[in-house]
Amino acid sequence: MPSLLIADDHPLFRAALRQAATDAVPDTTVAEADSLDGVLSALDTDPGIDLVLLDLHMPGNHGLAGLAAVRAQHPEVAVVVVSANDDPRVVRRALDHGAAGYLPKSSGLEELRDAVRAVLACEQWLPGSLRAAVARTQSSSTDTDLAARLASLSPQQFRVLTFVAQGLLNKQIADRLDVQERTVKAHLSAIFERLGVRNRTQAGVILRELELSDPARQLAD
């Protein structure tokens, strides 16, 4: 029985995704989260989740960092990015960072169903309206290299990197992870080496490079 996690901070959109998912695969079990912390907690708690429908912009996630976090900490889980942003360059970046599909929020219910069916069948999925444009969009060598470097981090190292990007000190990170401070320092040394950086500031910048502006918020402004 497939298991799916819907991650979006808008209840009405989560309800629409739930309906589409259960229509597409009737025996699917569906859980929900409204923040990136909720996503990672659900994945830690339930190792049986097969697919995450991940909003690019919700509490704790402002771009591709959430995708990178899920892929780094749970590489066995497929992720379909859900976003109001249908820029082919953003779609290409999401695919380069490990997304199994990309679903614009303007998609109809049938496209939602198609996406769920395809990705659960281990296929990559894009809406027909974006396929040609994305195919013409070249991957950025910088993005490809960044994705590879982030993928080289262990789940715990990625958590440490996330806290570093948030500006937390070693003691604070140790308290959050319930480990000793020297363990955090060891993780940082490994992170610096794998990312090819020299200090915390450079490491934090790498993760913040994955941030994207929110088109829905821009329209509201």
What are these regions (language model features)?
Residues 190-221:
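Basic, Lys/Arg-enriched C-terminal extension of HTH/homeodomain DNA-binding domains
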Residues 91-96, 105-151, 155, 209-212:
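Short, flexible helix-to-coil linker/hinge segments that flank and couple to helix-turn-helix
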Residues 55-56, 83:
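Active-site residues of response regulator receiver
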